[in-house]
């Protein structure tokens, strides 16, 4: 059976790949699989981002769920972490988010959460796929047993309350918020304003025709320009910026000079603060194989270890849970803090980071100054075969680079999960050296692929 789920739920072009028929089937199968052994009276929470196709797919998913006899609570436009949090807070049977995150406007997606607010395991996803493929045994309610769809937009306030709880007084800050015309268009600016910040919101409308278009965490240029403009106009103000993606499960930042503060920088600041108050479980942060070696070095000076997972917040979360840890993330801005939520939470991350800036009465630039980002070279080699990395010549080329770099750098050569590419990444302090080494390895891969 072909896989329906990808690395983060089901995604595709709305009404082409991800049709209402498939959405209905997923709603029906998901409800049956995830609630088979639970309380039959517990509803399923459903949320969405601002995409134009969101209401169409929401209606189909809700219909599929209702056909099994399960009620739904539609919370409207809310960030993905909001659906996860609300699902757990109201003790729902499950949660569903309709979003394609940072993908283009024509795409959409469906992801499920268990009653605890965590994303599904591979086994649960396969069970749903099997039920979509063979729905004969699924329940089909009739008469008074058909599920009822209820609007419950007010439940988004439960998520909002968790955002501002424990946040610092931000009245010393001017925060430019780029909401990407997405799910955080309301809750993001509102949270910072509630905590006292002067808020300048851009791309903060419910506009699914422009979600992620030249804005948000995938394009920081407008945000950086606005931060610099306000900083020049208000020299006595402390201006900084935060950008979310379409479903606000990630956040990136811009400091007072317009420089980008990525997820590695954020992890350093938050992990350091957690360790100081004794709240960093295992004194370990889970990053990914793409986390810069500069982060590893900076954490080490704080007595913090860096464990590495595969690329993707799904794999960061798996490593956290497997190792009994609570904090990790990615360069892309997915930060998972199991003290606060069960998934990446852009607004939650932003409140936590800006609270540290305000409490320590410092600048974002100063907070991340301990992280010296090592130069990184990333080359992509197009290949037709998937066994290229198994060849002796490629393995020896990688080993040779590892010996030459020693503790002063690292190499990662991996197959792309989405394209016919081999990615060659080398980090080190000498840019000319790592450029030479990366090109040598890439050429070896090219020859081996012929």
Residue map of PLM features:
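Proline/glycine-rich low-complexity loops and linkers
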Residues: 81-82, 126-161, 165, 256-329, ...
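Gly/Ser/Thr-enriched, mixed-charge loops and adjacent short helices
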Residues: 13, 108-236
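N-terminal small/polar loop signature for handling phosphorylated ligands or for N-terminal nucleophile
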Residues: 32, 36, 40-107, 161-162, ...
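An N-terminal, well-structured beta->alpha segment
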Residues: 1-63, 67-68, 149-175
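Phosphate-binding and adjacent anionic-ligand microenvironments
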Residues: 240, 277-450
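Gly/Ser/Thr-rich active-site loops/lids in small-molecule metabolic enzymes
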Residues: 119-121, 201-205, 259-278, 345-356, ...
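Short glycine-rich phosphate-binding loop at a beta-alpha junction
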Residues: 39-49, 73, 174-177, 283-289, ...
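General beta-strand structural signal in soluble alpha/beta enzymes
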Residues: 5-6, 46, 72-77, 97-98, ...
